[in-house]
């Protein structure tokens, strides 16, 4: 009997983006980001410096303390990653519509 291990062929989409809105990633833009991330099945992370946050957790996003001008790294992995990545990328690049 042989034991077959399934190997994970997970792909991921990742990109670095500058926070451009005046007040940075505070409660309102964090809520907008999380609300959009929750629409997708894919795993979403947002990172700044050495801190990696679950992109579907408002508390995690707020812990990044991403001020205007800081760079965040968006990573999306999962079945709808391309659509999720594009949606979340636009939200960041548009300054969270603030």
Feature map (PLM): residue ranges:
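Generic marker of residues within folded, mature protein domains
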Residues: 7-9, 64
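C-terminal structural segments of small proteins and small subunits
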Residues: 67-98
